[in-house]
UniProtKB/Swiss-Prot annotation:
Its EC number is 4.1.2.58. This is 2-dehydro-3,6-dideoxy-6-sulfogluconate aldolase. It catalyses: 2-dehydro-3,6-dideoxy-6-sulfo-D-gluconate = (2S)-3-sulfolactaldehyde + pyruvate. Binds 1 divalent metal cation per subunit. The record marks R63 as: Transition state stabilizer. It comes from Pseudomonas putida (Arthrobacter siderocapsulatus). The record marks D77 as: Increases basicity of active site His.
Length: 255
C-alpha cells in the first residue's frame, strides 16, 4: 500500500458491515481501515469484511484493539496485509509490535500452514514471503510518543507511522478539538521530523479541506471521515432538505 506514487486516500470502517466495506471499496477509496479498537467487530466479522474489501482493489488496514501478539496474529492469519497498532509510545513497544507481525527469525509470530492468508495452504511460499508482504503501521497518539518519534521510527520492521489527532488532542488537554493551535503545531512538527528521517506518516481528518491541508504538508497517506460519519452527514442533509429541521451539530471531528 505504501509504495503507491500518489498519496493513498482511505476512510474508517466503524459499522462492522461487509456490505458497507465493499461499497466504499468500489467507490474508489485506496484503503479502508477496519477499526477493532473502538468498534465491537469480532474476528468472524473481520473475516467477511476482508473478503469484501479485497474484491474491490482497495487495501485493508486492520487496527487491532491493543498491542497484543494474539490480536495481531489473528488479523494477519485472516489475510490482512496491513495492520495498525494503537498507542505506541516508545521503541520497546514498537519492537513488540514488529515482533508480533513478523515470523522468525525477524519476530515471534506464531505459524500455521492453513489459513486465509496462506490461501488455505495453497500459497506454498507464504511462510517465507509473509514478512515482506505485510505492513506494520504504528500510531503516534500522545505527547510521549511524539517525543520518542525518531526512536520509534528507527525500529527495524516499522513500515509507517500514523498520527491520531483525536487522542493527541485528548491527552494534551484539548479533548474533541484537534484544530486547537497547539495540536496543529504538533501535527506540523511530526511531518517535518518524519520527512527528515524518511519515514512515511499518515493521518486522519474529518473534512476534505483538512485532509487536503495535511497532504499539502507532506503526509504520505490519509483517511477522511468514516462510514458512519458519512452516513450521518448525508442523513442530516436529506432531513434538513425534506423536513426543514435544524440539523444536529456534529460532535465528531474525524471518525
Amino acid at each position: 500500500m505504501l509504495k503507491r506514487q500518489s498519496a493513498p486516500l482511505g476512510t474508517w470502517l466503524m459499522s462492522a458491515s461487509a456490505s458497507t466495506a465493499e461499497a466504499l471499496g468500489y467507490a474508489g477509496f485506496d484503503w479502508l481501515l477496519v477499526d477493532m479498537e473502538h468498534v465491537p467487530i469480532e474476528f468472524r466479522d473481520l473475516w467477511h469484511i476482508l473478503q469484501a474489501i479485497q474484491c474491490t482493489g482497495a487495501q485493508p488496514i486492520v487496527r487491532v484493539a491493543a498491542n497484543d501478539p494474539v490480536l495481531l496474529k489473528r488479523a494477519l492469519d485472516l489475510g490482512s496485509t496491513n495492520v495498525m497498532v494503537p498507542f505506541v509510545e516508545n521503541a520497546e513497544q514498537a519492537r513488540a509490535a514488529v515482533s508480533a507481525v513478523k515470523y522468525p527469525p525477524m519476530g515471534t509470530r506464531g505459524f500455521a500452514a492453513v489459513h486465509r492468508a496462506s490461501r488455505y495452504g495453497t500459497w506454498k511460499g507464504y511462510g517465507q514471503q509473509a514478512n515482506d508482504s505485510v505492513s506494520c503501521i504504528l500510531q503516534i497518539e500522545t505527547a510521549t510518543a511524539l517525543a520518542n518519534l525518531e526512536e520509534i521510527a528507527a525500529v527495524p520492521g516499522v513500515d509507517a507511522l500514523f498520527l491520531g489527532p483525536g487522542d493527541l488532542s485528548s491527552v494534551c488537554g484539548h479533548i474533541g478539538n484537534p484544530a486547537h493551535p497547539d495540536i496543529q503545531a504538533m501535527i506540523s512538527d511530526a511531518i517535518v521530523r518524519c520527512k527528515a528521517i524518511g519515514m512515511p506518516i499518515g493521518i486522519v481528518g474529518g473534512t476534505p479541506e483538512l485532509v487536503g491541508s495535511y497532504l499539502e504538508q507532506g503526509y504520505a497517506f490519509a483517511a477522511v471521515a468514516s462510514d458512519m460519519a458519512m452516513m450521518m452527514s448525508k442523513a442530516n442533509e436529506l432531513l434538513v432538505a425534506l423536513k426543514g429541521r435544524q440539523a444536529p451539530e456534529a460532535v465528531a471531528t474525524a471518525y
